[in-house]
UniProtKB/Swiss-Prot annotation:
5-phospho-alpha-D-ribose 1-diphosphate binds at residues 79, 82-83, 87, 89-92, 107-115, 119. Catalyzes the transfer of the phosphoribosyl group of 5-phosphorylribose-1-pyrophosphate (PRPP) to anthranilate to yield N-(5'-phosphoribosyl)-anthranilate (PRA). It comes from Phocaeicola vulgatus (strain ATCC 8482 / DSM 1447 / JCM 5826 / CCUG 4940 / NBRC 14291 / NCTC 11154) (Bacteroides vulgatus). The keyword Magnesium applies. GO terms for biological process: L-tryptophan biosynthetic process. Belongs to the anthranilate phosphoribosyltransferase family. This is Anthranilate phosphoribosyltransferase. Its EC number is 2.4.2.18. Anthranilate 1 binds at residues 79, 110. InterPro entries: Anthranilate_Pribosyl_Tfrase, Glycosyl_Trfase_fam3, Glycosyl_Trfase_fam3_N_dom, Glycosyl_Trfase_fam3_N_dom_sf, Nuc_phospho_transferase. Keywords: Amino-acid biosynthesis, Aromatic amino acid biosynthesis, Glycosyltransferase, Magnesium, Metal-binding, Transferase, Tryptophan biosynthesis. Mg(2+) 1 binds at residues 91, 224. Homodimer. Its cofactor is Mg(2+).
Length: 331
């Protein structure tokens, strides 16, 4: 570890193989918490390179419990987390709107590491019992178009760094890795990132991996489209900065997207959105993220049509019915 840290301090890059072996050693318990914290800190300060990130991804995928949903060509909708904004569960809400619109969603998530309520927290609040049983998950995909995979059941290696991540309370390379290690290797991905350098990083990674993608960033630092400012979208086909008004949305205020002080409060907001009882700012924020997820799967559709599809899923009750069926199947 000392030699690796020295190289990183000198701004040297690791090869894909070196990065893979480094993370495999961490998952095998070969380093203590102080060493892991030092490693996470130096990567946060100097930044991670494309080949390093792919190497880390390969390490975690080596140790994962795989599951095959390739027949469904699903999408995962996720943010890197760690943006410090403590928003409600926007990506997870968007998943149910997309599934309600008839698409297949394979959501991979975890408990909140730097926020009150991560995806696993809000899903668990509904009485869902996490599983890695392929038969149960396939039934959920078949009957409601939505699967939730709790990261710790599929990526047991992540447990070894959980306490360090919680103690640091800042974004780390594991926030960057989380969206890349969905155990079913989804065909599509909507990924929210907190800054423009991350957009470039992930765009390069997704292009090398051959994944259909949309990477989004609100220019005021949210790791999702928050509508609190202009936002940028990068896909296989285009790179554009949008103003919310260009797509028929109002500008939101940061406090309108607050996720609450407890998982219970976050769950209430989540339910309000899918019951179509939320505030306009909360609803619009979820709809716009769901819309770009739909376009990631159907790139020929203009974004205005994707917004209409997402809105119909919510306002018709299809998104809520998807949630109810999902809870019934997974409780």
């Amino acid at each position: 570890m000392k030699a690796i840290l020295s190289r990183l301090f000198n701004h040297e890059e690791l090869t894909r193989k070196e990065a893979k072996n480094l993370l495999l050693n961490i998952t095998r318990g070969m380093y203590n918490d102080a060493q892991i914290a030092a490693l996470l800190t130096v990567f946060q300060m100097r930044g991670i390179k494309v080949e390093e990130l792919i190497g880390f991804r390969e390490a975690l995928l080596t140790t994962r419990i795989p599951i095959d949903f390739s027949a469904y060509t699903p999408i995962d909708i996720v943010g890197t987390g760690g943006d410090g904004k403590n928003t409600f569960n926007i990506s997870t809400c968007a998943c149910f709107i997309v599934a309600g619109a008839g698409y297949h969603v394979a959501k991979h998530g975890n408990y909140g590491a730097t926020s009150v309520s991560g995806a696993s927290n809000v899903i668990e609040q509904h009485g869902v019992k996490f599983t890695n049983n392929p038969d149960k998950l396939t039934r959920s995909m078949e009957e409601c178009g939505m699967v939730y995979m709790h990261a710790q059941l599929f990526n047991p290696a992540m447990k070894s760094v959980g306490p360090v991540r919680k103690a640091l309370q800042v974004r780390t390379i594991f926030n960057l890795l989380g969206p890349l290690v969905n155990p079913c290797l989804p065909a599509y991905q909507l990924l929210g990132v907190a800054d423009l350098p991350q957009m470039r990083l992930y765009t390069n990674v997704f292009q090398k991996l051959g994944i259909g993608f949309a990477v989004v960033n609100n220019l005021d630092g949210y790791d999702e489209i928050s509508l609190t400012d202009e936002f940028k979208v990068m896909t296989n086909r285009y790179e554009t900065i949008y103003k919310p008004s260009e797509l028929g949305f109002s500008l939101a205020r940061q406090e309108e997207l607050y996720g609450g002080n407890t998982p219970e409060e976050a769950s209430k907001i989540f339910n309000n959105v899918l019951e179509n009882k939320a505030t306009k700012a909360q609803t619009d924020c979820v709809l716009i993220n769901a819309s770009f997820a739909i376009q990631a799967m159907e790139p020929a559709k203009p974004i205005e049509e994707c917004v209409a599809i997402a809105r119909e899923s919510l306002e018709s009750g299809k998104a809520l019915n998807t949630l109810k069926k999902f809870v019934e199947l997974n409780s």
